[in-house]
Design a protein with these regions (language model features):
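Aromatic (Trp/Tyr) and acidic
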Residues: 38-114, 134-193, 197-198, 219-222, ...
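Bacterial Sec-dependent N-terminal signal peptides
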Residues: 1-30
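N-terminal carbohydrate-binding/catalytic regions of secreted carbohydrate-active enzymes
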Residues: 45-73, 78-88, 327, 346, ...
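Metal-dependent polysaccharide deacetylase catalytic core of the NodB/CE4 family, i.e.
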Residues: 652, 674-802, 820-833
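Structural recognition of the beta-strand scaffold that forms the well-ordered cores
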Residues: 185-187, 192-199, 236-238, 247-248, ...
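Acidic-and-aromatic substrate-binding clefts and catalytic sites of carbohydrate-active enzymes
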Residues: 359-363, 378-379, 398, 659-664, ...
Length: 867
């Protein structure tokens, strides 16, 4: 996750240009409302924050978003103290929503204006933890199920070990750390242990939908979170090939050669591109093959943390999975790794090569406490318990939470200095000790928590973390520490503070954005993330937790940061902290493997048990009621819940064009429409949007003001042709297909939140597909049947071929026969037909429009038709 120069752009001209453009395009909105976009639990302390550029005296009501019924009245906006958190908004107010406890979907509405919040839900979250697990699978090295590809099979060649340098060591597997493709035991050991902790604390929240390779729809009888944890365990075993040996890092910053898919790695470490990479042995001494050296003093941090993970695995695989052989293998590794840590107390840091950035962890007693406690649980050997107590007192309150940073504006520590960000060792030891020691352990947690709570008093959102690099990881750590403290003591004193930090991650923050990719599905969330799968494949990767806001002073001192577009959050940037959803800012919007793994427990805490795998959205489009496949507007005609015709009492109708493989009619269609000042709708696949040859016509259609929407990413057949009720894709496949389509639209500036309608591939779907689409916030539309206009793609030798003249005549015949004519019609043709059809209907679009206008029809875009 450590970068030097990923974005090579002009250093002077581009920032100035972006500033000018941003200044010209900033919204004139003077009041904004911030809520947790994913929603609130019934008994939560629920808070909305109102930002205003002028004094605000409005009174709010809460309305049911589906029925419009007022459920709570006379909610006052309580003014908060002035602070540097408002950007251009100088006034902050808080609205308490805590009296609303009935599950449902709501909006906060100002009684005297059209100001309203985004929709929010009250009730348990869907299975967002499964989205986070899917992100982890996308980060896998070796076999990657997201890419269905194998990478880095040559990892790697040893350095600093007892064997000769460049000896081959099998270090394949593990996870790529972030947007780069380095692998660290520092982070992987923590991620592995934290997933097992999440499993043990929230077993009912995890399902089985993939196999051990992460392949979809191949359940193997093991909860997916344990499949993912085992991916980490297997890698740790490889890095610990024999007693007394441990490797800690694969590759270094020579990896940073722009975005690349892992199977096509262009980095060359001296053995050719996409070949061997260095594997660093943990010798407990300063390392670095070039000018920059680490400050390592021992190996206890990584050895202890790995030992803790192995000891936990022993318990789980022995008791829950009944795999005694693997359990015993893990226990043996745990004891040997722990012994290594005792022999070399101290910390092994990450290695850099040509840049000054590395993982600077310099704590280790917490890891040894964690390992000793877990080993005592596994073996009941008293020496482990004695060690755990000793290390606990040595670790004490040591935490990033203890930093004095009242201004939130300075980088107070080296990157990842006090890692992991939560000392789980205190929690692991707590049930094993006497009452006095229990109080001592609880006090360690409480000390850090109270520091954060005190600092939060100066923040209108109730957040008190220092804004170090990866501040979102600190927010997750605070939530986790409060939760573990509550489990230990039963003390709920800090529960509201924990909720405020959760809400910060999910949209109640100055920027009004979730910090998780794709969550909630129809909310504001990171899209232009610093991730190769996003940037190269133009596909969304749900679930990744991005680094998050960073102190402006730190941001300004980092190398290689250049925004690639105007700052959409320019109005809201606080004085001392910045956040950007821009690929050029690796410091705030790069998702990380370990931060996401830590957050799995947080998501599981707030989700319902026994939920289906996919989370779906928590916020609906303003055009669609969440989860509803009923026919909400009796002006329209529906088939299987999809709209197939608009208002039949109006002479307005829509011209719709779909496209996947072919686009040869684009210019002719655009010219015909422009000449007659007609706006139409184009539903195009992700494949169409990604095809370089189509870029010019897509940009023109957008510039001309046409509606551009999704038509699936890969043009999948969703439902069986002969048995329409038989769905041919899983919900996960459907959601990924649609999300990938939207990701391909994003480079053209098409905001999914402004695209409420979806036209399915093959113009074929069923009610289940409509339900899934509706749950994501999108209404399915389809063509009005009866004219056969949709047959304009058929090849000359197709038995169902129909000529363009015949299609045009059938449209006219239908208009004459139907008492309502073409009122409300959705008339579908294609933007291209391919080389096998020589008679192209798109050459008749001008003639068609002239005839429609002569009959008094008003062709408009589909979003206008279905208002």
């Amino acid at each position: 996750m450590i970068y030097t120069d990923q974005v090579l752009l002009m250093k002077i001209i581009l920032p100035l240009l972006l500033f000018i453009i941003s200044s010209l395009t900033i919204s004139a909105q003077t009041v904004e409302i911030r809520v947790n976009q994913a929603g609130y639990q019934a008994n939560d302390k629920k808070k909305a924050v109102v930002l205003s550029q002028e004094p605000f005296s409005g009174e709010f009501v809460v309305k049911n978003a589906d029925t419009g019924k007022v459920v709570s009245e006379r909610l006052q906006a309580r003014q908060l103290a002035a602070s540097p958190w408002g950007g251009s908004f100088g006034y902050y107010y808080e609205v308490d929503l805590s009296t609303i406890k009935t599950p449902g979907t709501y909006r906060l509405v100002d009684k005297s204006s059209d100001l309203r919040s985004i929709k929010f839900v009250i009730g348990p979250y869907p299975a967002y933890q499964e989205d986070l697990l899917a992100f982890m699978r996308q980060q896998r090295c070796g076999y990657n199920p997201y890419l269905d590809a194998v990478c880095h099979t040559h990892d790697g060649r040893s350095f600093y070990g007892p064997m000769p340098d460049e000896t081959f060591i099998d270090a394949s597997g593990g996870w790529h750390d972030a947007g780069d493709q380095l692998k660290y035991l520092i982070t992987a050991s923590n991620a592995t242990a934290r997933m097992m902790l999440a499993y043990e604390l929230e077993k009912a929240k995890f399902g089985d939908f993939v196999d051990d390779l992460g392949r979809d729809d191949r359940p193997n009888g093991i909860p997916d979170i344990l499949d993912e944890a085992k991916w980490g365990l297997d890698w740790i075993h490889k890095l610990h090939p024999k007693s007394g040996q441990l490797f800690h890092q694969v590759a270094d910053d020579r990896d940073h050669r722009g975005f690349k898919l892992p199977q096509n790695d262009n980095a060359d470490y001296g053995w050719g591109a996409n070949s061997y990479r260095p594997v660093y042995f943990a010798d407990g001494k300063p390392q670095g093959l070039s000018q920059f050296k680490s400050r390592s003093t021992g190996v206890a941090n990584i050895a202890g943390r790995s030992a803790a993970a192995m000891a936990m695995a022993y318990r789980i695989w022995k008791t829950d999975l009944k795999d005694t052989a693997f359990a015993l293998k893990c226990l043996a590794a745990a004891e040997d790794l722990y012994a290594m840590g005792k022999r070399q107390e101290g910390f092994q840091q990450g290695n850099s090569f040509g840049a000054p950035y590395r993982y600077n962890e310099d704590t280790w007693a917490d890891d040894m406490e964690y390992a000793a406690a877990e080993l005592y649980k596994a073996t009941r050997k008293p020496e482990y318990l004695a060690d755990a107590k000793r290390y606990a007192r040595l670790a004490g309150t040591t935490s990033w939470m203890e930093f004095e940073d009242s201004s939130m504006g300075e980088q107070m520590s080296r990157h990842y200095e006090m890692y992991p960000f939560t000392n789980v060792g205190h929690f692991a030891l707590y049930p094993l000790v006497d009452a006095k020691t229990k109080r001592e352990l609880a006090s360690y947690y409480r000390s850090g928590i109270e520091r954060i709570v005190a600092r939060a008093k100066t923040n209108p959102y109730g957040v008190g973390v220092p804004f170090l690099w990866c501040s979102n990881n600190l927010v997750v750590a605070f939530i986790t520490q409060v939760h573990l403290y509550e489990l230990m003591t039963g003390d709920k004193k800090y529960h509201d503070a924990m909720i405020a930090h959760r809400d910060w991650l999910l949209g109640n923050n100055p920027w009004g954005t979730s910090m998780f990719e794709g969550i909630p599905a129809n909310g504001e969330y990171p899209e232009d993330t610093h991730l190769p799968t996003v940037q190269l494949l133009k596909k969304q990767v749900r679930g990744g937790l991005v680094d998050g806001p960073i102190a402006a002073s730190t941001y300004n001192g980092l190398i290689g940061l250049t925004l690639t577009k105007p700052d959409e959050f320019a109005l809201f940037q606080p004085r001392d902290v910045v956040y950007h959803d821009d690929v050029g800012d690796y410091s705030t919007n790069e998702p990380t493997m370990d931060g996401t793994a830590d957050a799995i427990l947080v998501m599981a805490m707030f989700s319902r048990a026994g939920i289906s795998r996919l989370s779906g959205p928590r916020v609906s489009s303003p055009h669609v009621s969440k989860g509803s496949s009923s026919n909400p507007d009796n002006r329209f005609t529906y088939v299987e819940g999809g709209i197939t015709r608009g208002d039949k009492t109006s002479k307005r109708m829509a011209l719709v064009f779909t496209g996947d493989e072919f686009a040869e009619g684009g210019t002719a269609i655009a010219d015909a429409l422009a000449k007659r000042n007609i706006k139409a709708s184009f539903f195009l696949t992700g494949r169409f949007y990604r095809t370089r040859a189509n870029r010019q016509i897509i940009e023109r259609l957008k510039k001309d003001g046409h509606y551009l929407g999704p038509h699936s990413d890969a043009h999948l057949l969703y439902a069986d042709w002969t048995d329409r009720n038989k769905t041919l894709v899983t919900r996960q496949q459907f959601e990924r297909d649609l999300n990938d389509n939207f990701a391909a639209m994003r480079p053209f500036g098409i905001d999914r939140k402004q695209v409420p309608f979806f036209l399915p591939p093959y113009e074929w779907y069923n009610r289940e597909i409509v339900d899934w689409s509706s749950a994501m916030g999108y209404q399915i539309v389809n063509f009005t049947p009866g004219t056969r206009s949709n047959a304009d793609y058929m090849a000359d030798d197709d038995k169902n071929y129909i000529s363009s003249d015949d299609i045009l005549q059938r449209i006219k015949d239908y208009e004459a026969k139907d008492p309502k004519g073409l009122n409300g019609f959705i008339l579908l043709t294609h933007i291209g037909a391919g080389p096998k059809r020589t008679d192209k209907f798109f050459n008749h679009i001008g003639e068609l429009v002239e005839w429609l206008k002569s009959k008094g029809y008003e062709p408009i875009s589909v979003d206008e038709l279905l208002k």
